[in-house]
Amino acid sequence: MVDVPTSLPESRLGSTLRRDAWWMEILPVVIVLGGFGVYATLRAFENAYYSWGPYLSPFYSPLIDPQHHWWPFSPALLILVGPLGFRATCYYYRKAYYRAFFLDPPACAVGESPRRNYRGETAFPFILQNVHRYFFYLAVLFICFLWYDAVRSFLFDGHFGIGVGTLVLTLNVTLLSLYTFSCHSLRHLAGGKLDCFSCATFGRSRFATWRVSTFLNERHMLFAWCSLFSVGFADFYVRMVACGTFRDLRLL
């Protein structure tokens, strides 16, 4: 007869009865989010190779004061708060980096460091996570700028054309749009605090919006990761073309 432990080990960081490699759930998050953070920081401060022809890196969009008339630093630093704030306060990303970087907790049924007076997101600085719904509105504004950049990427010297960069930028803003509009805040905006859609003002429109946002919201994690890779690759591609490492292939 096999003895099966029935009591939990002493509560401490990493204590668990799990026998699987639970740390493999958070290791990719540390690598990807950490790597993206380093790359994005370097690119934001680089202040170079962010545009070529009709292409503009999403890290620098909208491009503000590139001639440094009143802002002496990288233009990317002016708009960083919008995309960064939206992702940093995102419900999914909060779960991901709380586990991966803060080990709070590291995984399901895995112990965390014992502490006193746990206050969660009710104390500074984590209480600022509650402004996520307002970052959503700001993110929608940035999506509009990025769609403008995507449309502009079809114009080469005033004539219609398609390059590899056109496809990269268009795919990127599509994935960013799916990530943005799959946000929990939009779903709550459409259907929150409602028990009866047909009784509410614009009930049918709100119900339709709620259904679509619910469908997208169920895939929010997928869109979060896909859009993270796409925005990083879009910037990387524009940089490589701008510095002459890559040659943009014209498809049309």
Label each residue range with its predicted role:
Residues M1-L252:
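Membrane-embedded alpha-helical bundles that constitute the cytochrome b-like, heme-associated redox core
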